[in-house]
């Protein structure tokens, strides 16, 4: 009940995690919910021994529309935050997340596709790599999302190849309820 192995199901977290990679999920990092238990039994409402994910954490969670599916994304917006994407630039509470272009890269999932490798650095100094497919990609421009209490805004690091909180729950993740979080990815 403390740790769980997890296989990366898609290319949405490239260039940091690749489809088929194995990681360990710390199920106690944020406390427990029914999502932390095998088969997702609806026996617990909310989280026990609740701790809050930090912006930049990579979390594994049960997809709200299909609790049998486990997905992985990076936490971008916390409860109370406003998140918006303008021209591919992530803004949290109207502050742009710092971006440093690193040069062209080949998309591992589609080797014929060239992307821009970018280092994003959060306000607290945490940084990570992302892929940017260029201007005009779906999801590059959004309205503001106000993250309500008990929910999170999550994104894949392969920004133009990720169904995440930029997309409504019927297609992507929508805003992620905290009780759907299984745990933190320990990479």
Each predicted region: which residue ranges?
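Aromatic-capped interface at the extracytoplasmic side
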Residues: 1-13
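Soluble "head" domains of membrane/secretory-pathway proteins
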Residues: 4, 15-187
């Amino acid at each position: 009940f403390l740790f769980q192995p997890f296989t990366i199901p898609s290319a949405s977290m490239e260039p940091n995690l690749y489809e088929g990679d194995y990681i360990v999920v710390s199920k106690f990092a944020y406390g427990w919910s029914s999502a932390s238990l095998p088969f997702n039994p609806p026996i617990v409402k909310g989280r026990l021994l609740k701790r809050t994910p930090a912006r930049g954490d990579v979390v594994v969670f049960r997809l709200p529309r299909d609790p049998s599916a486990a997905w992985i994304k990076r936490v971008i917006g916390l409860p109370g935050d406003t998140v918006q994407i303008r021209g591919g630039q992530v803004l949290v509470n109207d502050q742009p997340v710092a971006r440093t272009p690193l040069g062209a890269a080949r998309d591992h999932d589609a080797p014929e596709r060239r992307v821009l490798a970018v280092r994003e650095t959060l306000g607290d100094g945490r940084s990570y790599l992302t892929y940017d497919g260029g201007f005009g990609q779906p999801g590059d421009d959004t309205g503001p999302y106000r993250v309500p209490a008990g929910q999170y805004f999550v994104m894949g690091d392969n920004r133009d190849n990720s169904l995440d909180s930029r997309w409504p729950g019927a297609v992507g993740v929508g805003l992620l309820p905290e009780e759907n979080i299984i745990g933190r990815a320990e990479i």
